[in-house]
Amino acid sequence: MLLALAQWLQNDFGFLRVFNYLTFRAVMASLTALVIGLGFGPWVIRRLTELKVGQAVRSYGPQTHLVKAGTPTMGGVLVLIGIAVSTLLWCDWGNRFIWIVLLVTLGYGTIGWVDDYRKVVHRDPKGMSSREKFFWQTVIGLFAAAYLAFSVSETSNMRVLELFLDWVRSGLSLSLPAKSHLIVPFFKELSYPLGVFGFIVLTYLVIVGSSNAVNLTDGLDGLVIMPVVLVGSALGIFAYVMGSAVYSKYLLFPHIPGAGELLIFCSAMAGAGLAFLWFNAHPAQVFMGDVGALALGGALGTVAVIVRQEIVLFIMGGVFVAETISVMLQVTWFKFTKRRYGEGRRLFRMAPLHHHFELSGWKETQVVVRFWIITMMLVLIGLSTLKLR
């Protein structure tokens, strides 16, 4: 919005040309989201407290968590407001990638909000059923995947429509352009063609998987938000590179026109995330809830798909991956041993993984900071793929 206003007035006020610089708008988007979060955070926490939107704590979990009972949850609303307002203020409204990322983020946030609302307001400990939640995640994920399959390699929605019609006329056999291939990190020119259906399936798995992985990681004060900020910031750098004809050519990446604008979104996400961490740091004054975790995970997955860095997201989000795998292994092993031996056995003291370390004697703050450090290292490895190819 501010970009359009500045471009309209820049002939009379030359200093407004600074708005044309993507890096300037990215910095301002981050600061705007940070100010919104810090400014409205206390009010949001008070309102959540007054509404008695308190977190329920499982009695069979770590005993140190019992003191957290009643802490306001659904604080992810604050993050989403910061992201949405800041992005819309500083982005180019004509950029199609911004809108699809916002759609996924707010759509998944809505799913999380309904789930949280049922849990804390209706006092339903189950919230949305797994089937219902998965259905709506699938609807949004498949819609985004289908659009991006034809959008990533094109420069406008008209070209997207033309590519889709060409695909239909070809009997659904038309191959997607090379820009839509799966990029393999650390190799200069190694990529795999996916085809339309392959692209849609991969995109769906990345978006839904990332959303649920971030949600599983959100279990300790400050644990999930810093990795989200770090990974999101790194994806913003990839977006800037892929959106630049100069940098993408120099670094041997496909040029994706319009992808650079996602730096605005990622910067807003970083600013909003840091503001939330101010209140979520141990001892937390507010919890994110599914409304924030599902949305942020979906956002990371969508951005990664657009900038063709699905594998790099898997690397940088290693903490999210480990948490998810720990749950899958725990459930699978428990069911297998129960069927074979008559009683279920556990691989971990408790899943997700952060609870295993807690029950192994690590303090909560140790788990959190050590997971942050691991994420920092993984993000640096991910960023190294820009040049080490």
From Swiss-Prot:
It is a multi-pass membrane protein. Its EC number is 2.7.8.13. The keyword Transcription does not apply. GO terms for biological process: cell division; cell wall organization; peptidoglycan biosynthetic process; regulation of cell shape. It catalyses: UDP-N-acetyl-alpha-D-muramoyl-L-alanyl-gamma-D-glutamyl-meso-2,6-diaminopimeloyl-D-alanyl-D-alanine + di-trans,octa-cis-undecaprenyl phosphate = di-trans,octa-cis-undecaprenyl diphospho-N-acetyl-alpha-D-muramoyl-L-alanyl-D-glutamyl-meso-2,6-diaminopimeloyl-D-alanyl-D-alanine + UMP. The chain crosses the membrane at residues 25-45, 74-94, 97-117, 134-154, 190-210, 222-242, 259-279, 286-306, 311-331, 366-386. Pathway: Cell wall biogenesis; peptidoglycan biosynthesis. It comes from the Bacteria. InterPro entries: Glycosyl_transferase_4, PNAcMuramoyl-5peptid_Trfase, PNAcMuramoyl-5peptid_Trfase_CS. Pfam families: Glycos_transf_4, MraY_sig1. GO terms for cellular component: plasma membrane. It is found in: Cell inner membrane. Its cofactor is Mg(2+). It is an enzyme of class 2 (transferase). GO terms for molecular function: metal ion binding; phospho-N-acetylmuramoyl-pentapeptide-transferase activity; UDP-N-acetylmuramoyl-L-alanyl-D-glutamyl-meso-2,6-diaminopimelyl-D-alanyl-D-alanine:undecaprenyl-phosphate transferase activity. Keywords: Cell cycle, Cell division, Cell inner membrane, Cell membrane, Cell shape, Cell wall biogenesis/degradation, Magnesium, Membrane, Metal-binding, Peptidoglycan synthesis, Transferase, Transmembrane, Transmembrane helix. Belongs to the glycosyltransferase 4 family. MraY subfamily. Catalyzes the initial step of the lipid cycle reactions in the biosynthesis of the cell wall peptidoglycan: transfers peptidoglycan precursor phospho-MurNAc-pentapeptide from UDP-MurNAc-pentapeptide onto the lipid carrier undecaprenyl phosphate, yielding undecaprenyl-pyrophosphoryl-MurNAc-pentapeptide, known as lipid I. PANTHER family: PHOSPHO-N-ACETYLMURAMOYL-PENTAPEPTIDE-TRANSFERASE, PHOSPHO-N-ACETYLMURAMOYL-PENTAPEPTIDE-TRANSFERASE HOMOLOG. HAMAP family: MraY. This is Phospho-N-acetylmuramoyl-pentapeptide-transferase.
